[in-house]
């Protein structure tokens, strides 16, 4: 187990509720490697949330089956691992849905079919493109892409209700040409406030996704100003995820996640089991 300063270790969030394995198109990591690393990191619970992005635009590299989760094998395998690791760590079974406004019925059917513990709803496309490729930024400026993403997010969460938390709210900023220089809560407060109000009124939560720091943004998703606003508006449900696609990133920067949440007014973070929120006091 890696050694950390005692103060940080004692205040570390120990539940990682966003990670990907080889069941996701963009990860090659074995489930066992992820779970072993989580145990080494001292986590007491994790939720595996592999990708299901129906109607993800095909490309030459990934083909038409990109980000389609093999649920028929996913569930039996993870149930087996949950039992195998039960003396070492609590394993929850989740999924990350790539939201598009026309997918509500399809996703509802999927979620009703399997007893997931936790469902993340995330926006991975804007104007029909994954911002990861950079193409959409060639056509539109950063600010316009960001605004479109927030508007499309609002449309999706108004139409799709079969998720528990909204993942990495300002994810799109990672891939902008100017990244955070073109982004602040204040510049997009109208759009962001509508998203936050919709989540709260629908009983949905927000994710603190630590991967923004890994990608060099200097902040986790969403920006602390958005977290503070969510709390001001009455938001309480907040999960913490590394969004790890490799074992080495399990619990990424979780040593500072608790203090970040506290600085934004939170005293509890959230886990999910059987789709029910469980609140844990921040150390």
Which residues does each predicted region cover?
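Surface-exposed cleft-lining segments at the edges of enzyme active sites
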Residues: 132-145, 173-184
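Non-cysteine beta-strand/loop elements that form the S-adenosyl-L-methionine
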Residues: 46-51, 116-126, 164-171, 207
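An N-terminally biased module of ancient metal coordination in phosphate/nucleic-acid-related enzymes
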Residues: 5-97, 101, 105, 110-113, ...
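Histidine/acidic residue-rich metal-binding segments in metalloenzymes
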Residues: 70-84, 90-92, 109-115, 142-165, ...
